[in-house]
Amino acid sequence: MRIIITGGGTGGHIYPALAFLKYLKQEEPDTEVLYIGTKKGLESKIVPRAGIQLKTVDIQGLRRSLSPQNIKTAYKFFKSVSDAKKIMKDFKPDVVLGTGGYVAGPVVFAAAQLKIPTIIHEGNSFPGITNRFLAKKVDRIAVGFHAAEQYFPSEKTSFTGNPRAQEVADAAAQVEKFEQPTVVIFGGSRGALKLNNAFIEALPELAKRSFKTVYASGEIYYDDYKETFDQYKENPNLDIRPYINNMTELLAKSQLFLGRSGSTTIAEVTALGLPAVYVPSPNVTADQQTKNAQEYVDQGAAIIVKDEELNGQSLVEAISDILENTEKYQEMQRASLKAGVPDASQRLYNLVKEISN
């Protein structure tokens, strides 16, 4: 198979694509892959590091308000469509897969115009503007949340889950749990100021609880709090770090997750059957993180603490209410396992094979 994948801007569009490619290579080792992104997006660093060929087009996001910049964006869109067509005529893909982000717009649009089989994957519960635009033009639509199905034509939409779920589930298959109940608190790669402030407030109480807390502040914040963190560095119930490098292994060993509710995070957490306390970021488009988390709250796999209600007391109460209540923990664990999609890459692969044939 020859496949072009496009998607970028944030890790939520890139990491699912790379997880799928890893599975695809296992199934079809001779697969030829080309990734199309932008020079300034996160994909420009992540994709080459993964050993995947990257080509770029020059595109920028559309402003949601009236702006002269949108004229420039429109010009760049059609220029990128033209550039993408040239790349495709040279590479000759059997299928083109878009995973979201504004770069996917002109690339998948170009493929559809060239009559190349196309599929998009929507990772969030509320679709982004790019995938809503592409929905009528592509052959298949894969979604990571059941809530997203209502926004797309039912006859070509399938629930697959997020490919990161299968990658995490496979990697964690042989990992044993910590003996001491453990919660992982993580505010994303850069950290979250509100979460850091709540954690500082909660430290005296967390230090004496029956469970262990592994906390990542984010590298840009760690030095600001180091003096306080150092007061607790000998406490066996606390493991405080700037960043978590081995997140998959750590989550697999732990019993609970507390943090933001990005689509990839939720896929990883449910693939491992972890209960979760989600604190949706208020700084994302269309309040996507709240919508993401709500689907799993409705299934009994998670609870939500609103960002504006997060403080030391609410943080400790949310954790202890789950980890110190065996019956509630087990109910949430079962719900999380049921909600997880540990075969997400296989499901997406089946759709890709269907249209590429």
Swiss-Prot record:
Location(s) in or outside the cell: Cell membrane
Chain ranges passing through the membrane: none
Molecular functions per Gene Ontology: undecaprenyldiphospho-muramoylpentapeptide beta-N-acetylglucosaminyltransferase activity
Enzyme class (EC, first level): transferase
GO BP field: carbohydrate metabolic process; cell division; cell wall organization; lipid glycosylation; peptidoglycan biosynthetic process; regulation of cell shape
Membrane topology field: Peripheral membrane protein
Binding-site residues for UDP-N-acetyl-alpha-D-glucosamine, renumbered to this chain: T10, G11, G12, N124, S189, I244, Q289
Pathway: Cell wall biogenesis; peptidoglycan biosynthesis
Catalytic activity: Mur2Ac(oyl-L-Ala-gamma-D-Glu-L-Lys-D-Ala-D-Ala)-di-trans,octa-cis-undecaprenyl diphosphate + UDP-N-acetyl-alpha-D-glucosamine = beta-D-GlcNAc-(1->4)-Mur2Ac(oyl-L-Ala-gamma-D-Glu-L-Lys-D-Ala-D-Ala)-di-trans,octa-cis-undecaprenyl diphosphate + UDP + H(+)
EC number: 2.4.1.227
UniProt-listed Pfam families: Glyco_tran_28_C, Glyco_transf_28
Keywords, ordered alphabetically: Cell cycle, Cell division, Cell membrane, Cell shape, Cell wall biogenesis/degradation, Glycosyltransferase, Membrane, Peptidoglycan synthesis, Transferase
Primary site of residence: membrane
Annotated Gene Ontology cellular component terms: plasma membrane
Entry-linked Gene3D superfamilies: Glycogen Phosphorylase B
Function statement: Cell wall formation. Catalyzes the transfer of a GlcNAc subunit on undecaprenyl-pyrophosphoryl-MurNAc-pentapeptide (lipid intermediate I) to form undecaprenyl-pyrophosphoryl-MurNAc-(pentapeptide)GlcNAc (lipid intermediate II).
NCBIfam families in alphabetical order: murG
Protein family membership: Belongs to the glycosyltransferase 28 family. MurG subfamily.
Official protein name in the record: UDP-N-acetylglucosamine--N-acetylmuramyl-(pentapeptide) pyrophosphoryl-undecaprenol N-acetylglucosamine transferase
Organism annotation: Lactococcus lactis subsp. cremoris (strain MG1363)
Lineage per the UniProt record: Bacteria, Bacillati, Bacillota, Bacilli, Lactobacillales
Gene giving rise to this polypeptide: murG
